[in-house]
């Protein structure tokens, strides 16, 4: 089973408590502008707000867009997690479309297939400190770049 967080899912904006919006964007490295929260590429949006690793704390995915920054995929994403002390911390960022797999790394964090155009994608696994490339897959089967 595959949890796909793609552009079709982005159509529904998650309900994020106002008190957390600013801290989520700041943790993702965005700065506030007249048009909204900006990265170096474009105005971003919180596309996912849920407990992604089953620890009882919310996590968020902040996305921004632009082929000048992200090539043919046109999407960048930043995963931020609420810590036990209530603060938010960026865990990972990349260009591409994050596909959360059922396989897991440390602390219940799901492996991420970094999707986009092509036929062989890096799968990142959380090791307790960082998401690192664990393997390459296409449609659930091993592949090589």
Where are these regions (language model features)?
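Hydrophobic h-region of N-terminal signal peptides that target proteins for export
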Residues: 2-9
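Terminal domain-start segments
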Residues: 9-50, 144-145
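Acidic, small-residue rich beta-repeat scaffolds with periodic aromatic anchors
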Residues: 11-23, 101-145
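Short consensus segments that form the blades of beta-propeller domains
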Residues: 37-39, 67-72
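Beta-propeller blade termini
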Residues: 43-52, 96-111
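Acidic/hydrophobic-patterned starts of short beta strands in beta-sheet-rich repeat architectures
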Residues: 54-65, 106-114
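Short, solvent-exposed loop/turn segments at conserved positions within beta-propeller repeat blades
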Residues: 70-75, 117
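Beta-propeller blade signature
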Residues: 78-82
């Amino acid at each position: 089973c595959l949890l796909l967080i793609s552009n079709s899912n982005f159509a529904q904006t998650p309900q994020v408590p106002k008190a957390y919006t600013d801290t989520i964007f700041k943790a993702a490295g965005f700065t506030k502008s007249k048009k909204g929260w900006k990265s170096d590429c474009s105005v971003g949006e919180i596309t996912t707000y849920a407990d992604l690793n089953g620890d009882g704390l919310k996590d968020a995915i902040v996305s921004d867009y632009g082929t000048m920054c992200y090539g043919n995929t046109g999407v960048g994403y930043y995963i931020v997690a609420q810590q036990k002390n209530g603060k938010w911390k960026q865990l990972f960022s990349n260009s591409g479309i994050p596909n959360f797999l059922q396989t897991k790394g440390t602390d219940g964090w799901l492996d991420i297939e970094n999707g986009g155009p092509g036929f062989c994608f890096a799968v990142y696994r959380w090791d307790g400190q960082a998401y690192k490339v664990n393997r390459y897959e296409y449609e659930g089967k091993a592949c090589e770049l």
